[in-house]
Amino acid sequence: MRAPDKMTAAVEIYTRPGCGYCSAARSLLTRKKATFTEFDIAKNPSWRQEMYDRAGEGSTFPQIWIGGSHVGGCDELYALDREGKLDGMLESVKAES
């Protein structure tokens, strides 16, 4: 797995093994046919600190960015979907790539 490329990765998700919220967020992104870059901290523990640097200490898993904008976690991702905003965000980053 490569390090996050903040300039080109349209959708980024930081995850950890055994995290139900991480699985739910991945599932939603997959259902939306979003291409995303996943940073599993089990594969590279330094990604945990990188996530904290980007999202703030004490942030929970997962943490998600779309088009360089911090969305938050699984609850925020699903809220965007319920509000009808997620599809537009994903389409806009797809168009940029």
Feature annotation, model-predicted:
Residues R2-D5, P62, Y78:
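Short secondary-structure boundary/capping segments
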Residues I66-E96:
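Non-catalytic, surface beta->alpha helical segment in thiol-disulfide oxidoreductase systems
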Residues I41-S59, K85-S92:
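Thioredoxin-like thiol-disulfide oxidoreductase module
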Residues C22, P45, L80:
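Loop/helix-junction capping segments adjacent to catalytic residues or to phosphate/diphosphate-binding pockets
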Residues G56-W65, D75:
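Structural micro-motif
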Residues G20, S46, G72:
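Short alpha-helical
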